[in-house]
């Protein structure tokens, strides 16, 4: 087999990984958007669709991982090519987790459907989701361009989502203190808000991976963070 043919086959394998990552990203975005829409509108059918779609994302991550391992074994890539493949594995894992967070939000739709969500809280959740989805979309666009400058710019904006999450966290605590009947639905909403905030963290993870893929170095400095909920109590995934 000629060297040119081998390189052509290797290029196709890299293109496969890039294409599948893009497909995963599109589905993850849709799942998050649908999960929040289902939550705000008490749409049980849409919530169930999100839950079902998660298996597609899980399968895609597994297929990307398997393809990456086979490609490394066959081609023994070095330097930027190896970073490209390893980066694909890391990004696929982050996108799979984004899908899990969307699914977890969708699962809570049933729990809060009967009580309804105050419009002010619904707007807060929608705004938080909009910011997280913009960050996710932008980082997927940067994945296509492999721009380290743009990747670093996205990484430095993570604190905006944290600040909105902290504000929403406080509002939910206030609702719970005002009326004990709000405790159960607001607890579910706290978990949903944390799910959405974590999506921003995964977008930042992807930005850091892209930076590494493009430069071979890790981004310098600590991530900017503005999550102040630790002073009020904490909510975990």
UniProtKB/Swiss-Prot annotation:
Tell me a Gene Ontology molecular-function term this record carries.
protein homodimerization activity
> Which branch of life, at top level?
Bacteria
Where does it localize? Cytoplasm
Stretches for region Disordered: 217-237
Q: Residues of the signal sequence?
A: none
**Annotated S-S bridges:** none
**A Pfam cross-reference name:** PhoU
Which Gene Ontology cellular-component terms appear in the entry?
cytoplasm
Location (main, coarse): cytoplasm
Q: Name one GO biological process term.
A: negative regulation of phosphate metabolic process
Q: Which InterPro entries match?
A: P_transport_PhoU, PhoU-like_sf, PhoU_dom
Keyword field contains Transport: yes
| UniProt KW keywords | Cytoplasm, Phosphate transport, Transport
Description of how the protein assembles with itself and partners: Homodimer.
Family assignment? Belongs to the PhoU family.
Function per UniProt: Plays a role in the regulation of phosphate uptake.
Q: What is this protein called?
A: Phosphate-specific transport system accessory protein PhoU homolog
Query: Upper lineage ranks?
Result: Bacteria, Pseudomonadati, Pseudomonadota, Alphaproteobacteria, Hyphomicrobiales
């Amino acid at each position: 087999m000629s060297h040119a043919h081998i390189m052509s086959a290797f290029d196709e394998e890299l293109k496969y990984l890039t294409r599948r990552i893009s497909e995963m990203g599109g589905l993850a975005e849709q799942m998050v958007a649908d999960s929040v829409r289902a939550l705000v509108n008490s749409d049980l059918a849409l919530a169930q669709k999100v839950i079902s779609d998660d298996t597609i994302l899980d399968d895609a991550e597994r297929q990307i991982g398997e393809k990456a391992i086979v490609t490394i074994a066959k081609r023994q890539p070095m330097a930027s090519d190896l970073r490209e493949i390893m980066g694909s594995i890391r990004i696929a894992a982050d996108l799979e987790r984004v899908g899990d967070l969307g699914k977890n939000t969708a699962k809570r739709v049933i729990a809060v459907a009967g009580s309804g969500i105050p419009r002010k809280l619904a707007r807060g959740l929608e705004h938080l989701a909009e910011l997280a989805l913009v960050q996710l979309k932008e980082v997927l666009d940067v994945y296509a361009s492999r721009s380290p400058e743009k990747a670093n710019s996205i990484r430095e904006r993570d604190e905006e989502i944290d600040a909105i999450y902290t504000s929403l966290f406080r509002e939910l605590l206030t609702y719970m203190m005002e009326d004990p009947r709000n405790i159960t639905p607001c607890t579910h909403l706290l978990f949903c808000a944390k799910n959405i905030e974590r999506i921003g963290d995964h977008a930042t993870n992807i930005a850091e991976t892209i930076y590494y893929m493009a430069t071979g170095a890790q981004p310098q400095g600590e991530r900017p963070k503005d999550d102040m909920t630790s002073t009020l109590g904490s909510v975990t995934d």
